Amino acid sequence: KGIQSLNPRWGIPTNTIPYLGYNEAITLAMYGGASVIHPFSIEPLISSGIPMEIRCIFAPHTPETTTYIGPDIITQDSNLKAIGCKPGISVIKCHAPINSKILSMLEQIDITMWSIQTKGNFAYIVLSSSHMESIFPHVDSVDVNHFTALISFVGTIPSLSEFDEDGNWHEFSRSKNGGLFAVNTDNLEYLLRKLSANLELSC
């Protein structure tokens, strides 16, 4: 069925995305929205403008079962295309610039960072909460906050005011391709269902 607006692993039926720009697809692949593609499979296509087609080989080849990936196209009519979700994240807050010892330590113990952001005098490293037990013996003088999930919005970022009662949101970054938010919520599946329905991504 191509790439869905929400990863099918959540069991929430959503629409097939007809078109994704290269950078939108990379964002979705990196942050839990599309397990059928990998960022490294898209990056070589960008310089030459080669398109990619994602479709189910067991279904008829129709617009409803196919996602095309190509050059980024941003228009006034651009809208939210997809939601990515990585459950169970931790955010390490440290003084900027980031201490090289921290980055070296993460590399040595083979931990993947999902995002690094700098705001003012501080830097924020986002990674899986499952790695924290390995990290704590190697770091000190840092603040660590835990969140239910990292949510990525691909396309136009929606207003989250109507979802304030369902979760405590923390913005990490935003760009023309979307944004990254950490959220604490008592019911992640319910929040994803509500986001999908209210933002018109559900089937």
Where are these regions (language model features)?
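C-terminal catalytic "cap/lid" subdomain
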Residues: 1-203
